[in-house]
Amino acid sequence: PWGEYGVDVVLECTGAFTSKEKALVHLEQGAKKVLISAPGKNADATVVYGVNDDVLTSDMTVVSNASCTTNCLAPVVAPLHEAIGIERGLMTTIHSYTNDQVLTDVYHKDLRRARSATHSMIPTKTGAAAAVGLVLPELNGKLDGFAVRVPTINVSFVDLTFTAKRDTTVEEVNAIMKAAAESDRLKGVLGYNDLPLVSIDFNHDPHSSTFDATLTKVSGGRLVKVTSWYDNEWGFSHRMLDTAC
């Protein structure tokens, strides 16, 4: 009975009400808005804070905050697409295991997801790259990828390889990302790292994404590889609050 408690916005983090149709139950119980902490089917908008939150309007009632991986990827993709253009790209997220995985080998319709999260690197599907097209419509259908779940408890890593629309260099790519991280638009959302750090160093980092300039590669002028770290729990939680406010 949200109305009895004066609840304005429900942060839907159960994973059970991830479509607009299901999330409407919160509105029926008196809430005014619902923000889904996952990709949301038929949501009024899919938002990555700092990238397209300007699409929000007062009449929207059910909004998706996308996924933690989309929140890592989109702040990297947006400035690069603006500056040098992205024709097509493929992403891999090296992702810490989560609580929907199993700790011992069990039965599962997905045979890889049936395996112990603590014993293997587990390739699995993700819609994070494709979801960038909901945030940046000009890239709809141009990005794809998969995830590899690994036996670490927190912090994940996006590896994006793309074909640029023009020739570029490592130095230019890093300069674009450094400027983006310092911009009013992405300050606090996108970080920039040029030190030889590892995943644990980004635990409790509030950024959605921290670009790693030490790993940027360019081959033949137009084939570009970039990487970014993200605390898939803490950073995403901060963006839920930013979007809600």
Roles of regions detected by a PLM:
Residues 71, 167-168, 234-235:
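A generic structural signal for alpha-helix starts
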Residues 1-114, 218, 240-242:
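N-terminal Rossmann-like NAD(P) cofactor-binding subdomain of oxidoreductases
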